[in-house]
């Protein structure tokens, strides 16, 4: 399957483009590539591509989802028709017909599509990082098994509506000032279904649907983050007889972790070290999502220094590598010192503030200073 182009690239706009700029650019490109105006073989495909980009970027919610998760955020949350639903295409009212042959889901006539449902799913930090399968219980309307969704009593069947002849629509013609006006309305006898039920099903009362609780398995991909939405097509409420079911939208909420935070696909953590480890350097063990990892603290490290552990972050959506773990070190300052520790620190301070020795004494001083530091380390880490 061909990779979709970036929506901003399609419209030739920067990512911070205003809604007004997006609309203005769309109108210009739509006029240029509309199949009624442009007879080039690729014009219709280009027009569809432009219209899809506009439908997403002109909608605040869809644009935010796209900016955060890319095409995966749109494809996981919206059906093909939902992408275009609600978009203002100006004078290009044939968009829906061009894409879907005029079949508008949940339109004003005919049996109604089932309602979409939403479920808030809470997962742990680790589950978001590595992915998880969750079984959830969803209360929803389903097709009645007694009447197989027809709404009619077993052994009987719905009859064609005598008022509309099974179309679900009634056309009315009236003449005014010598001109004829034709209007089409939903049939009031069958309420747009085209059928009437003379003997309703005793279980569903003729609705063709009943309320049930269904267990559904949700596959949360590795790299999921709070605010991400997963669309499960057809897992919403059942539609009226002859109409499709709605969709189920799973909204992801990632619970906070005691030690880790997340920025995009990077993991942020803190590590406390002693001031002797910071001054002399040391190898320390760091907790990661993948277990403990050895990390080197170089001599002279300052508090709040940040070290990067490559590929110890979170799996990117759809398997394109991992983020890193950023470890910020915090140097612990001792609060209770015994007499020996105080004396050693005073000796070290005196050496640090002392005048530079002569060349022949420098070596001795350096050795003495090192000896003091080793004593300090032993005193504070024993």
Swiss-Prot record:
Quote the record's binding site residues for Zn(2+) 2: 161, 164, 187, 190
List cofactor names only.
Zn(2+)
- GO MF: ATP binding; heat shock protein binding; unfolded protein binding; zinc ion binding
The cellular location(s) given in this protein's UniProt record come to: Cytoplasm
The CXXCXGXG motif repeats are at 144-151, 161-168, 187-194, 201-208
* Chain positions covered by the region annotation Disordered: 146-168, 348-382
Instruction: State where it is primarily located.
Output: cytoplasm
Q: Which CDD domains match?
A: DnaJ (cd06257), DnaJ_C (cd10747), DnaJ_zf (cd10719)
Q: What is this protein called?
A: Chaperone protein DnaJ
What's the source species for this entry?
A: Methanosarcina acetivorans (strain ATCC 35395 / DSM 2834 / JCM 12185 / C2A)
The record lists the lineage as: Archaea, Methanobacteriati, Methanobacteriota, Stenosarchaea group, Methanomicrobia
Chain's gene name:
dnaJ
């Amino acid at each position: 399957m061909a990779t979709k182009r970036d929506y901003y690239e399609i419209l030739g706009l920067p990512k911070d483009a205003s809604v007004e700029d997006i609309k203005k650019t769309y109108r210009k490109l739509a006029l240029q590539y509309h199949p009624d105006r442009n007879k080039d073989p690729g014009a219709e495909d280009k027009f569809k591509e432009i219209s899809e980009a506009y439908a997403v970027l002109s909608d605040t919610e869809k644009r935010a989802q796209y900016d955060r998760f890319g095409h995966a955020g749109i494809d996981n949350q919206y059906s093909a028709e939902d992408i275009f639903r609600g978009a203002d295409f100006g004078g290009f009212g044939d968009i829906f017909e061009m894409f879907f042959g005029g079949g508008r889901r949940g339109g004003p006539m005919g049996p109604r599509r089932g309602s979409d449902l939403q479920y808030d799913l809470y997962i742990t930090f680790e589950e978001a990082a590595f992915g998880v399968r969750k079984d959830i219980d969803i209360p929803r309307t389903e097709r009645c098994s007694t009447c197989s969704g027809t709404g009619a009593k077993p052994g009987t069947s719905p009859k064609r509506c005598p008022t509309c002849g099974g179309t679900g629509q009634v056309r009315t013609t009236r003449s005014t000032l010598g001109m004829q006006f034709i209007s089409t309305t939903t049939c009031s006898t069958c309420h747009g279904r085209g059928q009437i039920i003379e003997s309703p099903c005793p279980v569903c009362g003729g609705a063709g649907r009943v309320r049930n609780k269904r267990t559904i398995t949700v596959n949360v991909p590795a790299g999921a983050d709070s605010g991400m939405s997963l669309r499960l097509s057809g897992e919403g409420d059942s539609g009226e007889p002859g109409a499709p079911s709605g969709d189920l939208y799973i909204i992801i909420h990632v619970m906070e972790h005691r030690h880790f935070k997340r920025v995009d696909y990077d993991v942020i953590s803190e590590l406390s070290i002693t001031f002797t480890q910071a001054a002399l350097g040391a190898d320390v063990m760091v907790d990661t999502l993948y277990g403990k990892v050895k990390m080197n603290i170089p001599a002279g490290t300052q508090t709040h220094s940040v070290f990067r552990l490559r590929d110890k972050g979170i799996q990117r959506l759809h398997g394109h590598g991992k983020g890193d773990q950023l470890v910020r070190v915090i140097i612990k300052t001792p609060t209770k010192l015994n007499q020996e520790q105080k004396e050693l620190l005073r000796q070290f301070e005196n050496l640090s503030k002392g005048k530079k020795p002569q060349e022949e004494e420098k070596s001795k001083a350096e050795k003495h200073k090192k000896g003091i530091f080793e004593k300090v380390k032993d005193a504070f880490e024993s």
